[in-house]
A protein has these predicted regions:
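Bacterial Sec-dependent N-terminal signal peptides
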Residues: 1-21
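Glycoside hydrolase catalytic-domain context in secreted enzymes
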Residues: 18-522
Length: 522
């Protein structure tokens, strides 16, 4: 028994020492490159293969899980796409798990502000909330890589994802891209609050057949237009991550394009993450028909220095290794960028990290960032500045509530907050109708509401009122969440381009205007 006790004590002592082991890659006094080299030496092959996915975790070495978040106009942890995950409801049905966040106007609205300081603050708020949910013990939403900003250019309004872009101008988009990156990543010279992963490189300008088409143009258009926001995002914004688009450029699909290494890494200095879009490996083989097998496609992706797959890849990487299509050194080169991002997020430091953001969400009774007054005021300011006055020839605006006895608010979007596919769940919502009613609280002005023109309801409301406000527009994901489907031709969304630029409610607007020339279109 005595010898057994000694053996047990020695075993426990060994386990204790192992648990407290300090690895060379945790030494913050070493250069970034030496730390990454040291980590690569510690990794087993299966761990390296795992790091080709979107999680930066290495549990054996104490490196915590860290995945991706959507965050084009605020952290998305809910919304139509259920970015917050799903859970079982009381009736046993699977329902979305919504976590409230501060949601700002879509990127196109952010572009309309022309305000780099505001767009930076939008990034700051989103990253603060990402850290809060990551580090709050009750949540632990393990993600600090933000899929934002979208540095694509909205050159054609028929593009189904126009609202995800800051606009069609390369210079403006570049300035706002840089601002948003700086907000997301923070101002600390060593650590990032979150990592900004731009998308979608390059020329993701169409949704229909995006999985198999090639955007063809010369090097001048590359440098001066399509790639310019990404170039500035890397060289000035110091983003070290982006997503490769589904489409090709002058032939090769972007996830295997030589320019990833030759230009973005070797010339621009992106030493971080390059990831595929969701399902891009399968599309590379089955839509682009670039490679005969999945193993050959997977090997080509890794050799192009694309270091993260957003779809099933492990069996194909293993097959590529077995067949000699890929080497462990190829994988090392591809995942170095992932490890650099992990380093800048403080994930490689161990428990004694100097990360200045590590306590966000850990303070007892901490007020959630989305409930703070400064967050509400920021959302209000950004929303106000995103509104563009196109025409006011009669000087109808601004309205004077004290001089109005009756105002008509009309249209299908007057009393509705529509979330897009990449939206989260707002902490609070105020519709246009509610906002107008709140502004007329004194009771001197009657507010009439008509959703549409059924039985002349809208026309009669307009005739009764001194002013009519008509709210029309597009639905940002086609009124139904079905993929590849938009029942209204002028609606667009991811995977579906618009077939028309005619608003579905133009007739309603014309009838209201005929009944009351004092009509405001929103």
């Amino acid at each position: 028994m005595k010898s057994l006790f000694v053996v047990l004590c020695l075993t426990m002592a060994y386990l204790s020492v192992g648990a407290q082991k300090i690895y060379k890659f945790q030494n913050t006094k070493l250069s970034d490159e030496k730390r990454i080299d040291a980590l690569l030496e510690e990794l087993m092959l299966e761990e390296k293969i795992a790091l080709l996915g979107s999680d930066l975790a290495v549990p054996r070495l104490g490196i915590l899980s860290c995945r991706h978040h959507e965050g084009l106009h605020g952290l998305a942890l809910g919304g139509p796409a259920a970015w917050g995950g799903r859970k079982k409801g009381e009736d046993g049905k699977i329902i979305p798990t919504d976590r409230p966040t501060t949601i700002f106007p879509q990127s196109y609205g952010l572009g309309a502000t022309w305000d780099v300081d505001l767009v930076k603050k939008v990034g700051e708020q989103a990253s603060l909330e990402a850290r809060y949910y990551m580090q709050r013990p009750e949540d632990k939403r393990t993600a600090l890589v933000m899929r934002a900003p979208n540095a694509d250019l909205a050159r054609d309004p028929r593009w189904g994802r126009t609202e995800e872009s800051y606009g069609e101008d390369a210079f403006l988009t570049a300035r706002l891209t840089v601002a948003n990156i700086k907000g997301l990543q923070g101002d600390n010279p060593r650590y990032w609050r979150t990592a900004a992963l731009m998308k979608h490189f390059l020329a993701n300008s169409n949704e229909d057949r995006r999985d198999s088409t090639s955007s063809n143009f010369d090097m001048r258009l590359f440098y001066e237009y399509y790639a310019y926001p990404f170039y500035k995002g890397i060289t000035e914004g110091e983003s070290h991550a982006f997503m490769a688009a589904y489409n090709g450029w002058n032939g090769p699909a972007m996830c295997v394009h030589p320019c990833l290494k030759e230009i973005t890494r070797d010339k621009w200095g992106n030493n971080g993450i390059i990831c595929t879009d969701g399902g891009a490996l399968k599309l590379l083989v089955n839509a682009h028909h670039a490679y005969p097998t999945m193993a050959e496609g997977a090997a080509a992706v890794v050799k192009a220095t694309t270091g993260q797959f957003l779809d099933v890849y492990k069996p194909y990487i293993e097959e590529a290794l077995e067949k000699g299509l890929l080497t462990e050194k190829d994988i090392d080169k591809a995942i170095r960028g992932n490890l650099y991002v992990a380093l800048r997020l403080g994930l490689l430091d161990g428990k004694d990290s100097a990360d200045p953001y590590k306590n966000i969400g850990t303070i007892p009774n901490e007020v959630p960032p989305y409930e703070r007054e400064e967050a509400k005021q920021l959302a209000r300011e950004v929303t106000a500045k995103s509104v563009v006055l196109l025409k006011n020839s009669k000087n109808l605006l601004p309205l004077n509530a004290s001089k109005l006895k009756k105002i008509a608010v009309i249209g299908p979007y007057a009393d509705k907050i529509v979330q897009d596919w990449y939206s989260g769940t707002p902490a609070y919502e105020i519709t246009i109708l509610e906002g107008i009613r709140n502004a007329m609280k004194d009771g001197q002005t009657e507010v009439i509401y008509a959703t549409n023109n059924a039985i002349d309801e809208a026309v009669n409301a307009a005739r009764e009122a001194e002013v009519a406000v008509v709210c029309v527009g597009n639905h940002p994901y086609g009124t139904r969440p079905d993929w590849f489907f938009c029942p209204v031709p002028s609606d667009g969304r991811e995977a579906v381009d618009r077939k028309s630029l005619m608003l579905p409610d133009e007739d309603l607007l014309k009838q209201v205007y005929k009944a009351n020339p004092n009509t405001i279109l929103v």
